[in-house]
Amino acid sequence: DPYNSLAKDRDMLKGISTHEYDYEATTDMRLFCKQYRVTIWLCTHANTEAIRQVYRDGLYQGYPKTPESSSIEGGGKFVNRCDFFAVCHRFIQHPTEFMNSQLHIKKVKSISSGGRCTPLDDPIMLKAITNNVGYSINNESLVKKLKAINAPF
């Protein structure tokens, strides 16, 4: 479930705003990750205004635009507090593009390992393989690669 589905501590909310609460929560998450050397993948949804934005023309005319980093519920504070931020966008009602998922990498704090943001109009494309048995990534089937290297699974 996304972050906004989690119940907030009502006693803590009596003294601070939800904005401050979210900052406290994300600070606690960062400290937890640092202390235990783990990663948290925090899922959120786009805010209502972002969902109303649609493409005006082209293949996706009339379908929701890809949300920006600051378009998440709760605003840009989540982007400001994280080391890595990605947006997964799907056109689930599109007659031909419903099986595609676009992965937009919006923030990479540490680029020393070779990571970087995706270009604005060139996301990583994941296409569901027939019968939903996996994905091809940028039109390259990972299933075929695994078979070629004789992977044990």
What are these regions (language model features)?
Residues 38-45:
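Structural recognition of the conserved hydrophobic beta-strand(s) that form the central parallel beta-sheet
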Residues 1-30:
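Helical hairpin unit composed of two closely spaced alpha helices linked by a short loop
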